[in-house]
Amino acid sequence: MHRIATRAAVIVLAILVVVLVAGCGGSSSAAVQKPSAAKAVGMLDARTLIDVRTPAEYAAGHIAGAQNIDVEAGDFASKIAALDKKAPYLVYCHSGRRSGIAATQMAAAGFADIVDGGAMADLVAAGAKTQP
């Protein structure tokens, strides 16, 4: 009888651990969407665009209307902290690596609606307009 009670207690404890672990961490990644480039282009007009490449890359050409906040610069966290966390954003970069990093950091900082637009070339190929 003692063995059955111990086994039941272990099962209940395991279920509680699974429920607690499943409940943790889901909120930050839920804020980040990763749509196809075509879908992301359809979202451009309704979002604040952030080019997370270096200032030199940005100066060489960027998606029309985007602002530049370099994700690898030391002041990235302070610059995003000044933004409205409830507003919708779309971040992009050269290859998609840095936009993923930026989107994850923004979600962790409490931003509620972030689209990881990925690579600028994919967005342009899907119809995004650029400016020098």
Model feature map: region roles:
Residues 92:
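Short, surface-exposed ligand- or partner-binding patches at beta-edge/loop junctions that are enriched
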Residues 2-43, 47, 55-88, 97-132:
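Rhodanese-like catalytic fold shared by cysteine-dependent sulfurtransferases
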